[in-house]
Amino acid sequence: MIKPFTYDIAIIGGGISSCVFATTHFRNGFNGRIAIIENGRTLGGRSSTRNSHTNKGWQLNHGSPNFNICNSNKNKLLNNFIQELLDKDIIESDSSELIELYGDSINNSEINNNFYIGENYISKYSMSELSQNIISLNRFKNNIDYYFETLIVNLEFIKNRWILTSKNGDKFKSKFLVCSSNLLLHKRSLDI
């Protein structure tokens, strides 16, 4: 048996929500160890960036090339967090007038959908870097270990600890488990 890696919190999924969760916990006084376990090659999850192998410097933000914040309750913590990202040049307002889906251009003013309500933002760099930049906001970034290209295939809760097993046989133990990946809805997750 491979000796398990031991953490206070194990997070499955390396997208924006995982990075915000980790950063917020450290800011609120948490000082334990966190593992972010991601099936992809880097942070970002559905907000990631593809780099061309043939055209150096060419990037495509896909999945979620931008994001919007609908803060109808005027949540001060959310406002402060977004303002910090703006002040530190991590994000900027998305002033795009058009959205293109499946080759059809749609004017923003024509969209009547809750997913487009609120302020739209884009990463100043790439969407993959957005998650890493959010992690970099906290001074405890060294308390986070990353496991990329690591697919969790089994979860068990034994003696008040989560035991996670990856496809390659690595085991992770943690007091707490956060499942942030939208792949929880995927067919392969039903087997867990």
Task: Indicate where each model-derived feature is located.
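Short hydrophobic core segments
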Residues: I9-I12, I37, I152, K171-H186
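N-terminal glycine-rich dinucleotide-binding loop that anchors FAD/FMN and/or NAD(P) in oxidoreductases
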Residues: N51-N79
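Glycine-rich beta-alpha-beta "Rossmann" dinucleotide-binding loop(s) and their flanking helix/strand
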Residues: K187-I192
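Conserved Rossmann-like nucleotide-cofactor binding loop
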Residues: S17, T42, L184
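Beta1/beta-strand and adjacent pyrophosphate-binding region of the FAD-binding site
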Residues: I2-S17, A35
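Glycine-rich FAD pyrophosphate-binding loop
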Residues: A10-I12, T23-T54
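Short beta-strand to alpha-helix junction loop
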Residues: N66-K76, N107-L137, Y147
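A conserved short coil-to-beta-strand element within the FAD-binding core of flavoproteins
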Residues: F148-I163
